[in-house]
Amino acid sequence: MKVHQKVVSKSKGSDSRSSVPHFDTNASAIKENIIHHLLSFQGRDPERSGAPDICRALSYTMRDILVEKWIETQKTFYAKRKKRVYYLSLEFLIGRSLMNSVINLGIVEDVKQAVADLGYDLTEICENEEDAALGNGGLGRLAACFMDSIATLKIPAYGYGIRYEYGLFNQQLVNGNQVEMPDSWLRYGSSWTFDRPMPIFPVKFYGHVTSEADKQGNYRAKWVDTTDVMALPCDMLIPGYKNDHVINMRLWTARASRELDLSYFGRGDYIGAVESKVSSETISKVLYPPDHNLAGQELRLKQQYFFVAATFQDIMRRFKKKPKSFDMFPDRVAVQLNDTHPAIAIPELMRLLLDEEGLGWEKAWDISTKTFAYTNHTLMPEALEKWTVELLGKVLPRHLEIIYEINLRFLEQVAQKFPKNVEMQRHFSIIDEGPPKQIRMAHLAIVGSHSVNGVAELHTNLLKTRIFKEFHELYPGKFNSKTNGITPRRWLLQSNPELADLISTNIGFGWITDLDQLRNLEPLADNAGFRQTWREIKTANKRRLAKYINEHTGISVSPDSMFDVQVKRIHEYKRQLLNGLHLIHLYHHILKQGDEGIAPRTVVFAGKAAPTYWRAKLIIKLICEIGEVVNNDPRVNGRLKVVFLPNYNVSQAEIIMPAADLSEQISTAGTEASGTGNMKFSLNGALTIGTLDGANIEIREEVGEENFFLFGMTAEQAEFERLAPSRTPKQVCENSPEITEVIDSIAKGAFSKGDKQLFKPLVDSLLDPNDQYLLMLDLESYLECQRKVGAAFIDADNWTRMAILNVAGMGKFSTDRTIRQYSEEIWGIPVE
C-alpha cells in the first residue's frame, strides 16, 4: 500500500503517536491502494473483482486520504482554539460521496487513470454507490450544501444528526400508486462512515424529577429512574474544495444500554429478552416515522432529543478538554438550529448548566441565548412544530419544567412591554393552552436564540410582518435574512461536467469558488458559436436523461422536445396538480387543433409524498394516469409525453437538472420559504416558469425579468383572496370553457378508466372556494404563461441566449455566500 510516514513536529502536550500516514495521490499509488483494499478489506481477487468491488475499494482509498487531512484539520482547530460551529440538523441529504470527494481533492485525472488501468471507467464505477439515505428534501440538501461550503471556507465546524438505517423510504410506483419500501442503503455497509468506539453517551428518557439542596443550600433538580439509550458516534468526512480542509458530520446511532436481558432469556422469553434492545434501536431506524398516532409522535420526539442530548454531551466534552469558565462558552461554541427539530436543545443546555454544572438561572440563560441561533424554514402554520404537554412531560419531564420556567420569565418581559394585555401574553406564550396544551417549538426557538433568520428576502419579510409579527416588534434586532444557496461544486462542476468545462475554458476556473464570476458569461450570450456549443451540451444531457427515463419507466422520449420538469416533494402547496391541469389542457388542444405551432414537450415529474399524506399520493396517481392516457394516444403522435420518475434522490437530480429546459417553480406565492431546486435548475441553464414566491423573486432580479416566465398572484394578492375573494373557482370555470373541459374530464373519469369517484377528492378541492392554495385562481395566468413558454422554445437560438443569461445571473446563489454571511453575521467567526 502506497503510504509514507509523515513525521509531525511535537507541540507541548503532544505524544509520540502524533505521526500521521501520508497517502500519495498519483495514479499508480491510487491503483495500488485500490488493490490493497480489494484484498485486505473485501477479500476479493483483483482479477475477478467487478465494478461494485472497485467502487468500494476506491471509496476506502479516498477515505484514507480524507482521514489524513481531517486529522490535520482537527489539530489546527485545537491549536488555534477557535470558536466552533455546531450545525444541528435532523437531515443531511448528501447523495453520493465518491465523485464529490475526488473532485474536491483535486485528483480527478489521477483517479480516472488508476481506474482505467484496472479496466474501468470512473463514471461507471461511481454509479455503483448508494445514495446516503440521511435526508428527504430541501432541508437536508441545504444542510449538505452548507457542509461543503463550510469546509471550502475553512470554518471550524461540525454537522450533527442521526445515522438512519433506512432513511425515509424507497418509492415504487405500482399502477400509478406510491408504495413505500425500506431504503436499505446500508445493506452492504458504507465506505464513507466509520464508527467511533468512543465517546459513547447515555441519553435519558421518561423517569421523574426530584430535588435536593446543594452545598450552598440552592435547589438542584435530579432526573431519576430514567430509561437510558446509548448514542454511538459515526463520522462522515466532508472535504473542502482543493484546500486540504476536511470537516466531519457526526451521526448518532441508537443502541440499547443492555444487549440482552438474561433474566427473560433464562425463563425462555426470548422476545422479552431483546425487546428493550429493539425498542431502543428503533430511534435511529427511519427518518420521520409516521406521526398520525401517539406512538409515532413519541418516536419522533425521542429521535429529536436523542441526537440533541448526545450532541451536547459531545460539545461539553470538547469544551472541557482544557479548564475554562462557562462564561467563555458562547465564545467557543455557536449552535445553529436547522428548523425546529433540534429546538429541544435549548432546554437541554439549560438542564446541563443548571443541574450538572450548578449554574444559576440568569447565568445559564445568558450563556444559552448567546449560544443558539435558529433558522426558520416554513411559512405554513401547520408545519410549525408542536408537542403536547402530556407527551413532552412523559418523555422529558425535566425539560417540561425548564420550558415552563422559560415561559414564565419570558411572559414577564411581555407584560412589561404590553401591560394588562392578557391576549398578547396568550399569543406570545410558548405554551398553547389548547386544548390540548402544546409546546410551540418555534416560539421556544425564537425566545431562546440570539438570531432568527429566514431563508429568502420574501420569507423573512413574511416572518416579520405576518407569522411572527409580534416577536419582531419585541425583538427588532433578532430577525435577519440569509437567502439559501447551493454548492456549485456539486450542482455544476460535478453534475454537468461538459458545461462546467465550457464555462471554465471561456472565463477561467475562478467561478468554482467565486460564483459571481459567472457574470463574465453575459457577453458570450451574443456569441453564435458559444450558443451552438451550449446547445450541443444541453442536447447531450437530454439524451442521457432520455436513456435514464427509458431504462427506469420504459417510456421513450425525444431529446428534441422541451424537457419541462417539476421535481420536488409532493405537496399541495407546491402545486404539482396545477401542472397536471396544464397537461390535460395541452392534451385537449392537440386533439382539437393538431400539433401545428406547438413545441413538443416531455413533462417530467419526480418526488415523494409522505406515507400518510393521502391527497398528495392521489396527485401522484392522477399524474401517472394522465401519462398513461397521453403517452398511449396515437393522435398525440409523441408531441406530448408525461413521465413520473420513481424514487427521486440526489443522484437522480444530478441527471435531471442538467437536462431540463424549463423549471417549474409554481408554488402559491407566500408558501415556499425559499426553495433550492429553482437555483439548481437555473445554474444548469433551465429557464423558470414561476410565481413571485421564495427565492424565485431574487432569481428573477438576478437573471433579468425578460429571462423568467412569471405568472400568478403575489403573496399579498393571495392573502387578500383568502380573506376577501374576488371570484370563486366555479366562476373561473364559468368564464373559461377550456378550464371547464379540463375539470370535467377528470370528474367524468377520462383519466381513471371511467371511475368518477377515484379523483373526486381532487376535483372537490379544486372547486372549493376555501382552497388555500388558490389553484383555480392562478390557472388562467399559468396557462397563458405556458403558451408564451411554448412559443419561446421554438426560437432555439434565443432560448439558448436566455439560458446563458440565467447561468450568468446565479452568482448570488452559492452557499459560499450564504455561509460567509452566517459565519460573520450570526456565528461571529470571520472568514479568511
Please annotate each region the language model reported:
Residues 2-832:
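A conserved ligand/cofactor-binding region detector
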